[in-house]
Amino acid sequence: MEKPIKPGRITALACMLTLLVIVFVVALYKLQIVDGKAYYEENRNSVASSQTVAAARGSILDRYGRVLVSNTSCNNLVFNPDDLFEQDDPNGILLRLARTVVSCGDTYVDELPVTTAPPFEYTDMTETQRTQLKGFLKYAKLDEEATAVELLSYCREKFEINNNYSAADMRTIAGLRYSIKTRYIDKLYLPDYVFVKDASMDLITSLKENNVPGFEVTVSYTRQYHTNLAAHLLGYTGLMNAEEYTTYKTQGYPMSATVGKDGAELAFEKYLHGTDGTAIVTKNAAGTVTGTTYTKEPEPGNQVSLTIDLDLQSAAEQSLTKGIENMKSKSTENSDAVGGGALVAVDVATGQPLAIANYPTFDLQTLFQSEENYKAVSEADNQPLFNRALLGQYSPGSTFKPCTAIAGLTEGVITTGTEIQCTGTFRKYEDTGYAPKCWIASSGTTHGNDNVTEAIRDSCNIFFYTVGDSLPIDTLARYAAAFGLGEHTGIELPESTGQMATEAVKKKLENTNWYVGDSLQAAIGQSYSLFTPLQLSEYCATIANGGTRHSASILKSVRSYDGSELIYENEAEVLSTVETGDYNWAAVQKGMYLVANDPAGSAYETFGSYGVKVAAKTGTAQLGDNQVNNAIFICYAPYDNPKVAVAVVVEHGSAGASIASIARDFLDAYFTVKTVSTAPESELSLLR
């Protein structure tokens, strides 16, 4: 039998329910009656807008995960036109903003290419500024030849700038109104106007404390360079121009997106660029943000790891700089002629570039800090911006002779035991007036009888003239192509393909016939052959590993932004092979070994007592017209277990032997075990 509910409990429950109803009614009365008007006004004056949330760009790392380029966030000031032009005096607000920026020590962006004080004249313009001005003049229906004064007169009238303002203040207001207005002119494709980039907290605080309307604070990311090395490889970023926008807009990029402009930043844009998000931002009447709701989270870009080793890159740049500047400092007849140069080191087993150095170089951290900095670098006589390692084209000189040797051996023109007598002069075509000499003839002696190994050691022109005379030029060119000379290397950065001297090349360049002398000169690396330092390093690696040419891709891997997920791992790609017998490789490799280790070798002075056995070939590329020769040098090491191949080029360096020390200094670093302070633990026991 159920127990009856006591009357007291029913009374208590009824009281509680009554109390809850009373509280609810009072709260509802306060919300709708007492505070209803205030809530209505707050809601009526609140503005919700959809805004883009910038995604961070991915970082660039070296092969061991050391950060080369990352991001740093910064606060920018941008105008809110809807808010600004609802104010009673937008021009006065703009002037107030500009003055506040200056008083806080910041700098604002004024895109009007007119001097800031009378007499008003046009300033020097970038191509973007010219396009912007042309579009504005067309919009304003002003003549393309309108003067700066006429332009400002139009701006004063169009933007209703009060005549009470001084000429300088009028110019300030006109510049800001011009910068805002051009964003709304059709087909100009300008990025969003950022009034102040990387605004200081003092400025932001001052503007907010004084309730200055018409602007917003946005967050963006700028690239931070953690090294001054590898400038030609890393590249830089920037806002899109109109031409780039036509390409990237199909991929969903907004006009204000930052994209890679050069180097790895451009080559790996698809990995580095993130996907922007969106958010609903609510503001009250004072412009204060009262709420942010993400409708799409931004997706940051991925980490890109290069094949470059930062320590080896440092060693390459230091060795190259030291070597060239030492050559310049010597009081010799040709020291003043010494120019730029390059050093490239690649992994023999994979073809991966480990270091790509140029001289002169530049510092990405300071290049774009000011127009003066960029102008000084871009207009320098020695062309620091020129990527000699990838774009420079140089005659290989005698460094080409191993290629001629392999071609001759493989085609049966010679064997490893064939001896050719050097008499100092190649006399076969003497009756036609053509009798080229060996380099040693100037000393009044000869090389005597040389086999192919000895001929490489001695760099005997007569031997290689004889081989080249028996090889059709197209056959020699086929071997050069298999070695990658005159071919794309597979690197993702802009490169020159160079050219192998052939009948077709001469016809194209000079529209003249091919003669036997052209074949002889091509066989010793002269004539019309031009190759890049990167090609020469990969060629040397192919000799070292016995005929396998790999891609020179500088992409090692791609990982997610936080490094937790592997997205892509680049594997060594074989581009071509040079098929010949092992005994032929051994003969050529031994010849290069003797260049560095036999007293008769041209690099013996540099490597004869070196702690690691090196195989090398020197080259002297004649330029004619009384110019000082270019110096070319290739080597690989260790000789009996090749790991690294190096190519060095110095413009007007006189002779290949004179730059062997640059490669030696680099190898010193290569064969030095890294210390705990500079290397991940997994590297400590490696001799690379």
Name these PLM-found stretches:
Residues 36, 58, 66, 73, ...:
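Solvent-exposed coil/turn segments that connect beta secondary-structure elements
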Residues 91-99, 201, 205, 209, ...:
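Solvent-exposed, polar/charged alpha-helical surfaces in well-ordered, non-transmembrane soluble domains
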